[in-house]
Amino acid sequence: MAQWNQLQQLDTRYLEQLHQLYSDSFPMELRQFLAPWIESQDWAYAASKESHATLVFHNLLGEIDQQYSRFLQESNVLYQHNLRRIKQFLQSRYLEKPMEIARIVARCLWEESRLLQTAATAAQQGGQANHPTAAVVTEKQQMLEQHLQDVRKRVQDLEQKMKVVENLQDDFDFNYKTLKSQGDMQDLNGNNQSVTRQKMQQLEQMLTALDQMRRSIVSELAGLLSAMEYVQKTLTDEELADWKRRQQIACIGGPPNICLDRLENWITSLAESQLQTRQQIKKLEELQQKVSYKGDPIVQHRPMLEERIVELFRNLMKSAFVVERQPCMPMHPDRPLVIKTGVQFTTKVRLLVKFPELNYQLKIKVCIDKDSGDVAALRGSRKFNILGTNTKVMNMEESNNGSLSAEFKHLTLREQRCGNGGRANCDASLIVTEELHLITFETEVYHQGLKIDLETHSLPVVVISNICQMPNAWASILWYNMLTNNPKNVNFFTKPPIGTWDQVAEVLSWQFSSTTKRGLSIEQLTTLAEKLLGPGVNYSGCQITWAKFCKENMAGKGFSFWVWLDNIIDLVKKYILALWNEGYIMGFISKERERAILSTKPPGTFLLRFSESSKEGGVTFTWVEKDISGKTQIQSVEPYTKQQLNNMSFAEIIMGYKIMDATNILVSPLVYLYPDIPKEEAFGKYCRPESQEHPEADPGSAAPYLKTKFICVTPTTCSNTIDLPMSPRTLDSLMQFGNNGEGAEPSAGGQFESLTFDMELTSECATSPM
């Protein structure tokens, strides 16, 4: 079954997570219309190869045209309009950046597969009593459901008792007025009043019963309000707080378990019960106005009950107003909460009380740093204005599940310029990527005679003015959301708390697993721990400061740990994503460990790892070989950076890499990817077929062109070889080989970085006849 069809059969909670994946950057409608074709493409490869991305993008536009023709034949005007709009949007945004749409689609498809896997795992664990985590969560939710059901039942029982009391009071009122009228007549006629006294006794008995019923109802109302208070505290202080924490985790790459539908159903159910109870309390006031007496419990307790139910409902409504989707720039969906001035960002708010009567009634206003006292307390903090459509009315039509929400799609920030270049005080206490700002959403609710002011705010955001500030800004977002669940601590970085390696390791792994199909292994994390903390046996519980993580240079390096790692993450996403997803890149491994695992392998075995010395992010390969004396040697090529990988894919570099041996013959030192995968099996599918690489020769030309192929060659000196006699033919060949590369800019990749001895080596990227 196609992946998209499987997704349609999931429960509502999973479908809500599916909705979170899609936005204007890649509309869900397009995913629906072209599901089979989209799933048949290799988007991961397209995301790492611009030429292939361009081809796939143009094929995508062609598929849209074909689907449009089908809708045209079906006279489906709405779908025609939507598809035309989608195509125009894709052309305007991705025509010059086809790799961007490829990355977005690849990420969505991978998240879909993760969602299916999560649903399947949950289904398998549903009936297993030996899964403690699943059992605790299920039991907790069942208890909450039972409490809500109990509240609803008690409200309905009270409704019936209110009717009984009302009927009893009507009977008492009628008999009392009748007796009073008869008593007046008897007084006028002077008749015996024995009958009247008998009826008075009956009225007293009715009043006693009425008083008992009233006291019972007042007592039950007080107990019901206490039960509501308990359920509300569980919902807001536990369930909603847990959701907000999960949202924080999801923002920094953690599991996207942030569905709100179930929580919305619970809160809506409680709100409905509270409003019904408030009407019952109002009914008590009506009964009191008709019949009242000395010691009336309604007179004594109704005002307090009214005050309690109104306070509960107000607090529930205030808690139910949440930011469903945190501020995020569409071009950087994997890095929310970082906003660049002048660049549009989106956000979405939602009211978890699903009352149809509130549809199109709540006007939301957006502002930034409303409570500017905390922000202003930081010397030199910048100030911003929100531009664009900063007001919107909440409605149920825009959301896929009918929730009451408002999505802001066209917001931008502009810095308020001051005389010293925009900063309020040049003596700033924090750098700009450590400044935290809050985006606030406000509205007013008028419902059943109540006016309630609602306000919620985003998680703290970092505002940058240049995209080069993104790495440090994202580090701030990671550190904040990793270490605190305080949603408003804009002073966090005046004294940033210390994290533990266990916390940092989990977040670092998320940076890979959230944008690729693979997180970090224990061995890879251990290597990173060694870079941060130095050699050690057990890093669990070791403390890491904010400065060590992001600001201080690593030992012997001119850059920080985070700058180095972030550039590697960028390198993986843009250039070697497919190879990383396959698990072919060992990545983070110490040179000692590298030597240990390769030294026992046959010559030609190689592994792929990230450079430890390249600030911009580099990837290299290390292989084992035998020198002429039979001694095992471990060799590494100088790391390939983004600049080289822009011109040739890493898979093609590996497949074509050559060295010139002692006999001046080009040979490939790379045979088996560690541990024993043939090179062709691992990387062949990621190289273009020769038929695509070399177009047909012009049939009208005098002679066909000779086909050429770019390969990376490392010519060696004789420092580690015995001088061999060289024939004139070999010398001529080498001279010609050197002249072919004359004038060309030498590639940074292709040079040895010897792990055993120093070698004087050069690098050339040459063309050789096919």
From Swiss-Prot:
Effect of mutating residue 415 to G: In ADMIO1; likely pathogenic
Modified residues (N-acetylalanine): 2
Leftover remarks: Involved in the gp130-mediated signaling pathway.
PTM comment text: Tyrosine phosphorylated upon stimulation with EGF. Tyrosine phosphorylated in response to constitutively activated FGFR1, FGFR2, FGFR3 and FGFR4. Activated through tyrosine phosphorylation by BMX. Tyrosine phosphorylated in response to IL6, IL11, LIF, CNTF, KITLG/SCF, CSF1, EGF, PDGF, IFN-alpha, LEP and OSM. Activated KIT promotes phosphorylation on tyrosine residues and subsequent translocation to the nucleus. Phosphorylated on serine upon DNA damage, probably by ATM or ATR.
Mutagenesis / variant outcome for changing residue 394 to T: In ADMIO1; pathogenic; results in increased transcriptional activation
GO biological process, one term: negative regulation of hydrogen peroxide biosynthetic process
Residues where N6-acetyllysine is found: 49, 87, 601, 615, 631, 685, 707
Disease: Hyper-IgE syndrome 1, autosomal dominant, with recurrent infections: A rare disorder of immunity and connective tissue characterized by immunodeficiency, chronic eosinophilia, distinctive coarse facial appearance, abnormal dentition, hyperextensibility of the joints, and bone fractures. Autoimmune disease, multisystem, infantile-onset, 1: A disorder characterized by early childhood onset of a spectrum of autoimmune manifestations affecting multiple organs, including insulin-dependent diabetes mellitus and autoimmune enteropathy or celiac disease. Other features include short stature, non-specific dermatitis, hypothyroidism, autoimmune arthritis, and delayed puberty.
InterPro entries from the UniProt entry: p53-like_TF_DNA-bd_sf (IPR008967), SH2 (IPR000980), SH2_dom_sf (IPR036860), STAT (IPR001217), STAT3_SH2 (IPR035855), STAT_linker (IPR048988), STAT_N_sf (IPR036535), STAT_TF_alpha (IPR013800)
Annotated phenotype, changing residue 389 to A: In ADMIO1; uncertain significance
Residues that bear Allysine: 601, 615, 631, 685
Annotated positions of the Phosphotyrosine modification: 640, 705
Consequence of substituting residue 664 to Y: In ADMIO1; uncertain significance
Name recorded for this polypeptide: Signal transducer and activator of transcription 3
Recorded consequence of changing residue 103 to W: In ADMIO1; uncertain significance
SH2 domain span: 580-670
Family to which this protein belongs: Belongs to the transcription factor STAT family.
Resulting phenotype, residue 278 to H: In ADMIO1; likely pathogenic; results in increased transcriptional activation
Effect of residue 361 to R: In ADMIO1; uncertain significance
Gene name as annotated: STAT3
Annotated tissue distribution: Heart, brain, placenta, lung, liver, skeletal muscle, kidney and pancreas. Expressed in naive CD4(+) T cells as well as T-helper Th17, Th1 and Th2 cells.
Highest taxon listed in the record's lineage: Eukaryota
Effect listed in the UniProt record for changing residue 218 to A: In ADMIO1; uncertain significance
